[in-house]
Regions:
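Loop/turn-to-beta-strand initiation segments
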Residues: 53, 80-82, 107, 120-123, ...
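Conserved helix/coil segment N-terminal to the catalytic DExD/H
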Residues: 112-145, 155-156, 161
Length: 190
């Protein structure tokens, strides 16, 4: 059973308990897979649930992908559209298939510039440039409620950094999860 099949019927949940129902469903899924969230994963995921923008600068292998899964699940449960960005098409493709396994192929799409698969899906894996171009074209009115930016340290690259910077400036209504193992001090971003 994929994670989207576990989505609670939130119409039956009192508004004051919606976030709790979403969180309980997600943590039941992780526990069912034998995964206990690390403190940093839980803190970041709860920040996303609370509507915060989150910077997750933790080492390789510390579970950033699980926080991204939580973010996508939270957005999906709320009827929102989320985008996952990566710097290269091969990583986008890899993440697309991983997200299909977790959320079901009907809920996941991919946009790379070369190809678009299921482009109207609620969860989209895309290159950073795709999201930046959507942000430039549509601004705050873009059909993007949440952006998970992996490898966010690319923001400082002279040639491609714009693709990580533009969404932050133009997608003023979107929630962001910025992830990197090599970002360094993030206090200036907060």
């Amino acid at each position: 059973m994929n994670l989207s099949q576990l989505l609670p019927d939130l119409t039956e949940v009192p508004e004051s308990l919606v976030d709790e129902a979403i969180w309980d469903t997600f943590t039941s899924w992780t526990t069912g897979r034998g995964i206990n969230l690390y403190p940093a994963q839980e803190l970041a995921s709860l920040g996303i649930l609370a509507g915060d923008n989150v910077i997750l600068a933790t080492p390789t292998g510390s579970g950033k992908s699980m926080v991204a899964n939580a973010a996508h699940f939270i957005a999906l449960a709320r009827g929102q559209r989320s985008f996952y960005t990566a710097p290269i098409k091969a990583l986008v493709s890899e993440k697309f298939f991983a997200l299909c396994d977790i959320f079901g192929a009907e809920n996941v799409g991919m946009m790379t510039g070369d190809a678009t698969v299921n482009g109207n899906a609620p969860i989209i894996a895309a290159t950073a440039e795709i999201v930046a171009n959507i942000a430039l074209r549509d601004g705050a009115e873009a059909n993007i409620d949440q952006v998970v930016m992996d490898e966010f340290h690319y923001y400082s690259e002279p040639d491609r950094g714009w693709a990580w910077q533009v969404p932050l400036l133009e997608l003023s209504k979107a929630q962001f999860l910025l992830m990197s193992a090599t970002l360094g001090d993030t206090h200036w971003l907060e």
